[in-house]
From Swiss-Prot:
Organism: Francisella tularensis subsp. holarctica (strain LVS)
UniProt GO MF annotations: rRNA binding; structural constituent of ribosome
Family statement drawn from the similarity comment of this UniProt entry: Belongs to the universal ribosomal protein uS15 family.
Subunit structure comment from the entry: Part of the 30S ribosomal subunit. Forms a bridge to the 50S subunit in the 70S ribosome, contacting the 23S rRNA.
Coiled-coil intervals, chain numbering: none
Protein known as: Small ribosomal subunit protein uS15
Keyword Magnesium: no
Amino acid sequence: MLTAQDKQKIIKENQLAESDTGSPEVQVALLTARINDLKGHFEAHKKDNHSRRGLLRLVSQRRKLLDYLHDKDVERYRSLIKKLNIRR
């Protein structure tokens, strides 16, 4: 589970402006952190299919945001993919 300090750190690293908390970059970074956090959960609990459904929903939501960013600005998309080490 991400703590409030972890979220603030992720937001600070990815925000475009001082008060930016809702840009696609910030949202994708937060979703990526949650997805990576759940990966560790599934190593210990392989049969937790209820949480797996939630993971798939998070991955889908991140994919939609990445597709939106790709349509709007390809350079921002590529830099974000490289920064977060997301494969495409």
